[in-house]
Amino acid sequence: MQIVILKDSAEVAAYGANIFIKQLQKKTNSVLGLATGSTPVSLYRGLIEACDAELISFKDVTSFNLDEYLGLKGTHPQSYRYFMNEQLFNHIDIIKAQTYVPPGDAENPLEACVGYEEKIKAAGGIDIQLLGIGRNGHIGFNEPSSGLMSRTRVKTLTKATIEDNARFFHDDEYQPHLSITMGIGTILDAKKVVLLATGENKADAILATVEGPLMAACPASALQLHTDAVLVIDEAAASKLSDRDFYKHIENENQKLMAKLP
């Protein structure tokens, strides 16, 4: 894994956005894996600005989101389809029919999971997958104990995840306890993975992901198996890593090398 430690959340978002901008400039018909939550919002703003400046275009892009609450229609304000429309899709030149989010209102969720995998395969696979990380190390809605080679499926959310996401729902509003999520195996199939994490509350999860053993108790630790995974984190999220200075040294040397390449 490539570990990039930056000062704060603004630098993390800018660095992450630049990775996606370079990908779209290199391959205009890229297949993007996208994520929701508070961490990617600033990254999406960077992509919107780049699109407005005509540095990139999304006209030929296909996107697949990681997950969706089971039981919410795409028009529900807390659905991830609604989130993506509001935070990104409504502000760029992407064709909405080429944006896919797991159907939270599917009549047969099990069939919908199989169909989602088939759509990803038909698109040629995901070129670059964006991830956040939960306090318990979950990626997507792959909670601890998830199989490390799992595929898109229905998952029950843990108490910790439900509590973390409760702030998005009103006290009298239904909050789903089930989801449809890409599996860890689905995520690992992406050609490149970019995980963003900020804040001290993510420090334990980052420690387990980077320096802990490969284990189902920390789903994000599966990224140790990926040949092109980049973790972009701020100082607070990196605060419990024992080799912070070494990771910074490696990244500095990598940047020097990249600057010399044609």
From Swiss-Prot:
One of its GO terms (cellular component) is cytoplasm. It holds the Pfam family Glucosamine_iso. SUPFAM superfamilies: NagB/RpiA/CoA transferase-like. The active site is at D67 (proton acceptor), N136 (for ring-opening step), H138 (proton acceptor), E143 (for ring-opening step). Keywords: Carbohydrate metabolism, Hydrolase. GO terms for molecular function: glucosamine-6-phosphate deaminase activity; identical protein binding. Pathway: Amino-sugar metabolism; N-acetylneuraminate degradation; D-fructose 6-phosphate from N-acetylneuraminate: step 5/5. It comes from the Bacteria. Homohexamer. Catalyzes the reversible isomerization-deamination of glucosamine 6-phosphate (GlcN6P) to form fructose 6-phosphate (Fru6P) and ammonium ion. PANTHER family: GLUCOSAMINE-6-PHOSPHATE ISOMERASE (PTHR11280:SF5). Belongs to the glucosamine/galactosamine-6-phosphate isomerase family. NagB subfamily. This is Glucosamine-6-phosphate deaminase. It comes from Shewanella sediminis (strain HAW-EB3). The gene is nagB.
